[in-house]
UniProtKB/Swiss-Prot annotation:
Expression sites (tissue/organ): Expressed at high levels in kidney and at low levels in heart, lung and placenta. Expressed in colon.
Species the sequence originates in: Homo sapiens (Human)
Biased composition (Low complexity): 84-100
UniProt subcellular location: Nucleus speckle; Cytoplasm
Name under which the protein is recorded: Zinc finger protein GLIS2
Amino acid sequence: MHSLDEPLDLKLSITKLRAAREKRERTLGVVRPRALHRELGLVDDSPTPGSPGSPPSGFLLNSKFPEKVEGRFSAAPLVDLSLSPPSGLDSPNGSSSLSPERQGNGDLPPVPSASDFQPLRYLDGVPSSFQFFLPLGSGGALHLPASSFLTPPKDKCLSPDLPLPKQLVCRWAKCNQLFELLQDLVDHVNDYHVKPEKDAGYCCHWEGCARHGRGFNARYKMLIHIRTHTNEKPHRCPTCSKSFSRLENLKIHNRSHTGEKPYVCPYEGCNKRYSNSSDRFKHTRTHYVDKPYYCKMPGCHKRYTDPSSLRKHIKAHGHFVSHEQQELLQLRPPPKPPLPAPDGGPYVSGAQIIIPNPAALFGGPGLPGLPLPLAPGPLDLSALACGNGGGSGGGGGMGPGLPGPVLPLNLAKNPLLPSPFGAGGLGLPVVSLLAGAAGGKAEGEKGRGSVPTRALGMEGHKTPLERTESSCSRPSPDGLPLLPGTVLDLSTGVNSAASSPEALAPGWVVIPPGSVLLKPAVVN
């Protein structure tokens, strides 16, 4: 007896198949419909209407035990699964494929005639293919392994409507001949199309050719070029079976198997060797003093000897500059850096805040609302003050031309920044933009309370010159601290020393930590 754990043999007789089913039912019991669903790989348990092409009940696999079944399935006896449809479909008189002895034993009803199989539709439209249905709603269904339904592979035939591969069609101008073999196409192009033209040499008229009619001065060059269109690769590696269109590429490839490296670096003291000249040329760029490939992002001064290194830098840091931005950079060059101090000191009586480039400040290269380039040079804030800042003459120790005590900076009225780069445009939360020093002593008390405590801890690490400058910047008893020379500690947050933004002095702008860089500079 055949085992049902093996793939189903469609040549089993009715008696053997029924005996195997009865023996399995005695040992395993009745298989539930959901178990049969899982065995057949059916996920959806929702009721589905019967297929219009399903065969009548006599053609279904089912147990002989009656059971109440839904209207979508009907009880049907076991039938012979053969490799061909029932003979009643082919014979004109509707004769059955089952013997009279099997019909007379009472187990099997008479097989339906050919007229009952009219709505039956076969797979792929081929009448010789077998199609059967399993009653999923019956209780005593036959347990079939999933491997039983694996059909043998069939030869795939392409539809005549599908287009032929492009390499088998001659795309030469006014020539669309079809070929079955690639060699036939290559011979056709080489014999009929590769011909010299008057005053032009060997020109390629293949559809979509990038040369656009520019000819070759030799026939062998034309034949090599044609291989880019026909995809011909006649040179094959005997070791790994890779094919190449040019013999030189095959020779270079063979060196990967032999380990030969004939190209040596020409620089003295460098004995690196390479298998091809292009890799050696890339290596020789590392010995150049000049680095012609540089980053075009404002504020970035990276330069490289190899273009691939520049591409890696641009991809890693997001320094993508469009053509429009490059034109603006050429029209508006970045300002020159400030001159160094004549006495070698860090600064005289001012401070500068360097605003980073747009990519570092906003986190992305594409800023449609921001005019580029943003000047990468330092922004001098030492001379910025509110409107009525030219107070009393307490300006001892200041540089010439600077106002007296410089009041809190008002970045919203900054004349050095264009209008889109106000305090709100830079994404800086504006606490107060009040002009003047109308706050009085009470607001001065708040201003003194907003000084971070970390700034006091930094006094022990300062140089003597920094201690002198910080001593001059202590807040006066009547109002706000005097600038320039004030030590600003931006490393702490807004609420580090004050519980609310109201503790800040009027006119000050809260700058997030890490957004700006304080740098000593010279005020001319």
